[in-house]
Amino acid sequence: MIPRGIERVVIIGDGLTARLRRAYARLWERRPRRDGQLQTAGHRPEGGAPTQGDNRCVTPTASISSELAQRIHQAIAQAGGWIGFDRFMAMALYEPGLGYYTNALQKFGAMPSSGSDFVTAPGLSPMFGHTLAVQVQQALQVTGTSEVWEFGAGTGALALQLLDSLGDAVARYTIIDLSGTLRARQADTLAPHAHKVRWLDAWPEVIEGVVVGNEVLDAMPVQLLQRTGGVWHERGVVSAGEKFAWQDRPTDFRPPLEIEGEHDYLTEIHPQAEAFIASLAERLQAGRGGAAFFLDYGFPEAEYFHPQRHMGTVMCHQLHQADADPLVAVGQKDITAHVNFTGVALAAQNAGLHVLGYTSQAWFLLNLGLAERMAQASLAERSQAQRLVNEHEMGELFKVIGLATSGDWAAQGFDRGDRSHRL
């Protein structure tokens, strides 16, 4: 079933600077239709139900959380006492200077003692980026381009690994990132390649080349839908004194699939991620073309909206611990939701792109030669790289989808284990 009312615009926050407002307006300006049928061409734990928090979290960074909470309370009041979770999530993550991805708090790192909250694949092993570079190089050759684009580059580790591996095949590496703090860290990391790297905080009109996004889609705001007593509601956030609380309102929104049964059911829909893909498709097709590869945790639609997955997938991450309560410690922890890869594929196809393939991260990296790299590495290096493909870690939980303006070539990363037929 098509989510009704999908045209509703999510307001990111009244306090956005003009620059960030323009950036997000361009980033999420379109809502793709879900009226097409899929056609295929040529590390964080499982989610759980958001629960009412007790707001007892006290940390050295409580002042950031307190100021951000006040900003959100103001937004709730201005909206008449209720905002959708998508707006809450957007403010918690991206409110200028206060949101999780825009404040100066440490985020990425392998050890909680450093103050970090989680580690991503490039920080786990440089073999991740060096192996991904094989796919990027093939895509650059096929598309006849020489520019790589990365959304949400984190510490810059993946960019460094790709630039080190690709050499002269890349003339320019463009990072689109809204975080000034992370941008400074990226600049330090990428100093050896400074002559090739540039940063943008908004969409360009044209994108030519190869786009990569590692754990980008999961951080895009989602809407929460709750079925209670057979009636669908949108779950939003209200003020409860100094705290936040959940409040459900009847809605015409529906999940894209009919959920069997009459049991209570919590899930998400992803208009922001689908609009992002549609905007990307428009810009790739405005120039000479290109390809895009997104790596993230998620499922095909049939798995995402399985009747037994009744608690949703929204999760938070702080100091390498996961919890299911986004209403506490706002600005101090990451908020994510799993990716509906069927929705991504349909959004791409409806906008004119081809699906090159869809598979697990393990198959993708093994197809690109990770096993051969590991055979030449030290025991410690092999141990770290093994986590990238271990079935019980990143290997199966994380998936990869490839998109391109042309579907008449076979992307090496999907040679074996392609699951496009499951989308």
Model-found features: residue ranges?
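Intrinsic, low-complexity polybasic segments
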Residues: 18-21, 26, 30, 35, ...
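Active-site flanking residues adjacent to catalytic metal/cofactor-binding acidic residues
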Residues: 149-151, 176, 211-214, 295
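A mobile, often basic/glycine-rich helix-loop segment
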Residues: 212-258, 307-317
